[in-house]
Amino acid sequence: MKILAGDIGGTHTRLALASAEGSRVGIDKSERVLNAGRDGIEQVLADFLAGAGRVDAACLAVAGPTDGLSARFTNLPWQVESAALSARFGLPFHLVNDFAAVGWGLNTLTDADIAVLQTGQEQANASRVALGAGTGLGVSLCVAQADGPHRPLDSEGGHIGFAPTDAEQDRLLVWLRAAYGRVSVERLLSGPGLIGLYRFCLAEAGRSATMDLAAPAAARAISEAGKAEIGRAHV
């Protein structure tokens, strides 16, 4: 069975063709493309599937809420309809929330796939949570089931309100509110959020930016700058 798998984020789309035999899955082809400058996902899929031969089914993980049939992206001006994609490409399409997909993926990890940051006592049947900062903040809460693997609950948890816990965070909230109005945790824990945090730290220190904060790679440059002494002083 050949499967088209996709992860459509706010900035990039990642696609793969996989061959599945029983519980074994092998990746035949993969690609990552920028979403900027594109009107939607259909042409991206058409380019990727050119010459692929027969594909039996497709599943796309989307960065936004979905009922499995349609999705509107949180940080991307696209809308996707599974019926329209099925009609265009002649195969069944299913849509899932991107962090629901991450949650299901947690069930397949082995010890070799995991880097332990803090040791702790594992609790049988405890819930799990997956967090991922990208263009936005993805959150997946996974609950144990009596008769199967942990089940992820679709969540837009990155949009919960930011709750300061000290005076510096109070100032950060006021600073961000002036720019955005309501301040969610995604305004801090994301690529764009990192740029906002950097601007705040510069303002607190009375300094000016030494890089182009409007550049596409600004968040990466800020991460590198954070390794320097001035960056660590504000972490």
Question: Where do the model's predicted regions map?
Answer:
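Short coil/turn connectors at secondary-structure junctions
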Residues: M1, G90-L91, A124-R128
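Short glycine-rich, Thr/Ser-proximal phosphate-binding strand/loop in the N-terminal lobe
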Residues: K2-D47, G51, L153-G158
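Residue-level signal for inorganic ion chemistry
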Residues: L15, L85, L194
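Short beta-strand-loop/turn "lid" adjacent to the catalytic site in phosphate-handling enzymes
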Residues: G51-V96, A100, W104-D113, A130
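ATP-dependent carbohydrate kinase catalytic cores
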Residues: D67, H94-Q123, P216-G231
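Glycine-rich phosphate-binding loop of actin/hexokinase-like ATP-binding domains
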Residues: D113, L117, A124-V185
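A mobile "lid/hinge" subdomain adjacent to the ATP/sugar-phosphate binding pocket shared
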Residues: A179-R232
